[in-house]
């Protein structure tokens, strides 16, 4: 019988399958739909220091093999999360062992640091730092584009945060290996990648861009091979765990990331198509392992790299 248990930053998870931020709410919304005993962790909806209403206009747009979103980090703010949503997330942990991950964004170094400090004093298990947010001090360029800027914000957050720190990287980074090395040197305990890919859609009838901000984030099966390439690069660049995400929709998809060296995986857009996607992926992983005589994920983690 396959054993999917996965150790991530000292937390032993039921499986390597984590719900990606922005696709599973704060976990409790899925409790009646999914078997949480098969889910390793939940990365809650992205937070900012202060609550945000998010973007106006269209927010979701389907593509032939993916989903474009322009939510705009709508969230209640860090303190509200600590007071209201986190206790519900921790109830899931108590019932099922699901690791509680807080995803934190920000629009300045000061916002990141204050938010991380508050989360550091909370009962959350892991802080996932979203550095795809625009830096208002440099004309809106995302922190996750240049390694130097990313390293600086991670260094500042590391000093303020006692919790295990996982940094979520953008595929728009100028150089993925250098970005990974920069955030590792700055104190990241783990890396997750990739975030969504910048995309655009045009409404032919309205003769204008679908989204008010013109560009938005593409996720889903279309991006998976590119995300897998970036995870491969990341694993080869650093000595900290890499959590892979981007278009994972089946157990075979997840196993590709594991064989590339990922410590765990996150599932995002697939949850919109199938609210039981996470447990289905875990089941499919276990079935493949049983069929192929693999007892634990450690037996195959990074095995594809032997061909290098």
List the predicted regions and their residue ranges.
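Small/polar glycine-rich anion-binding or flexible loop at a beta-alpha turn
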Residues: 248-252, 274, 306
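C-terminal helical cap(s) of enzyme catalytic domains, especially alpha/beta-barrels
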Residues: 54-64, 202-216, 258, 270-295
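Hydrophobic faces of well-ordered beta-strands that scaffold small-molecule active sites
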Residues: 4, 17-20, 40-44, 100-104, ...
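Extended, intrinsically disordered, low-complexity segments
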Residues: 224, 283-308
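Short gly/pro/ser/thr-enriched loop/turn and capping motifs at secondary-structure boundaries
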Residues: 48-53, 134-136, 198-201, 272-274
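Alpha/beta enzyme core
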Residues: 107-243, 252-256, 260-267
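N-terminal capping/small domains of soluble enzymes
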Residues: 1-100, 106
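Surface-exposed amphipathic alpha-helices with a cationic face
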Residues: 7, 11, 82-95, 120, ...
């Amino acid at each position: 019988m396959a054993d999917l248990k996965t150790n991530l930053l000292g937390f032993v998870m039921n499986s390597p399958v984590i719900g990606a931020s922005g696709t599973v709410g704060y976990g409790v919304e899925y409790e009646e739909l999914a078997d949480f005993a098969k889910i390793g962790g939940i990365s809650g909806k992205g937070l900012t220091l202060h609550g945000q209403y998010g973007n106006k206009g269209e927010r979701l747009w389907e593509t032939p093999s993916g989903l474009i979103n322009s939510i705009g980090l709508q969230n209640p703010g860090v303190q509200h999360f600590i007071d209201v949503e986190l206790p519900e997330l921790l109830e899931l942990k108590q019932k099922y062992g699901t690791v509680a991950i807080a995803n934190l964004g920000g629009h300045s170094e000061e916002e990141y640091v204050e938010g991380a400090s508050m989360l550091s004093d909370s009962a959350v298990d892991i802080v996932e730092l979203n550095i795809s947010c625009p830096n208002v001090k440099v004309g809106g360029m995302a922190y996750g584009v240049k390694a130097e800027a990313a390293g600086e914000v991670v260094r500042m957050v590391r000093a303020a945060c006692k919790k295990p720190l996982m940094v979520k990287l953008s595929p728009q980074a100028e150089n993925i290996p250098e970005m990974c090395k920069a955030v590792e040197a700055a104190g990241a305990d783990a890396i997750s990648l990739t975030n969504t890919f910048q995309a655009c859609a045009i409404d032919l009838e309205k003769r204008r861009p679908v989204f008010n901000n013109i560009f938005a984030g593409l996720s889903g099966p279309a991006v998976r091979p590119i995300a897998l390439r970036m995870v491969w690069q990341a694993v080869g660049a650093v000595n900290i765990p890499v959590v892979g995400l981007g278009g994972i929709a089946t157990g075979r998809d997840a196993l590709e990331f594991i064989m590339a060296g990922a410590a765990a995986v996150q599932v995002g857009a697939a949850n919109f198509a199938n609210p039981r996607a996470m447990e289905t992926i875990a089941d499919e992983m276990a079935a493949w392992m049983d069929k192929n005589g693999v007892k634990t994920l450690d037996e195959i983690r990074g095995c594809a790299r032997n061909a290098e």
